[in-house]
Structure formats: C-alpha cells, structure tokens
UniProtKB/Swiss-Prot annotation:
Lineage, broadest ranks: Bacteria, Pseudomonadati, Pseudomonadota, Gammaproteobacteria, Aeromonadales
Protein name per the record: Co-chaperonin GroES
Molecular function GO labels: ATP binding; metal ion binding; protein folding chaperone; protein-folding chaperone binding; unfolded protein binding
Function of the protein: Together with the chaperonin GroEL, plays an essential role in assisting protein folding. The GroEL-GroES system forms a nano-cage that allows encapsulation of the non-native substrate proteins and provides a physical environment optimized to promote and accelerate protein folding. GroES binds to the apical surface of the GroEL ring, thereby capping the opening of the GroEL channel.
Gene: groES
Keywords recorded for this protein, A-Z: Chaperone, Cytoplasm
Record's keyword annotation contains DNA damage: no
Single biological process term from Gene Ontology: chaperone cofactor-dependent protein refolding
Cytoplasm found in the keyword field: yes
Length: 97
C-alpha cells in the first residue's frame, strides 16, 4: 500500500532508540522511552498560504529528523510497519550527519 500525504503533512518512520541507560543498564517496558527521531518517507505538496500560494516543505524524503510527538501526530500501519503522519510544524530539527 502507498500513502501520499496531503499539503504540509509528512510521513515518518520512527528510528528506535537504543534501550540502554547511560550506565549500560538495559531498559524494558515503561522505562524505555519512545524515540522522537525518525526518517522522512514521504512529504506533501506544501503548505497553502493565506493568499493561496503553496510553500514547499523544508524537509525531503530521506531526511533524519527530530519531531514533537504531540496531539496532531497520527500512527498508521503501512506494509506491516508503524509510521507517523504529522504536520511539518511538528518537526523540530533536521539531523545532519
């Protein structure tokens, strides 16, 4: 199945954080936090401005990002894998390696 996001929406695959503490203790269950990093899988056409123009998104497919997992984030299954659908405004930063 393919999903094509609309407007300023972005589809992200979560990059799982390592489940170890700084001291090397393996974290399980509720002790392990969900990662707020992900890889952009698809982007919409852009944000529609008040004057009707469309502004292209700052992120592109393949970007590694840090996002805010808040109220507007939707989780969906895509080919057996959980993906997140969120607005570009929920993306806090692009990780440059």
């Amino acid at each position: 199945m393919k999903i094509r996001p609309l407007h300023d929406r972005v589809i992200i695959k979560r990059i799982e954080a390592e489940a170890k503490s700084a001291g090397g203790i393996v974290l399980t269950g509720t002790a392990a936090q969900k990662s707020t990093r992900g890889e952009v899988l698809a982007v919409g056409t852009g944000r529609i401005l008040d004057n009707g123009d469309v502004k292209a998104l700052a992120v592109k497919v393949g970007d590694k990002v840090i996002f805010n997992e808040g109220y507007g984030v939707k989780t969906e299954k895509l080919d057996g894998q959980d993906v997140l659908i969120l607005s570009e405004t929920d993306i806090l930063a692009i990780v440059e390696e």
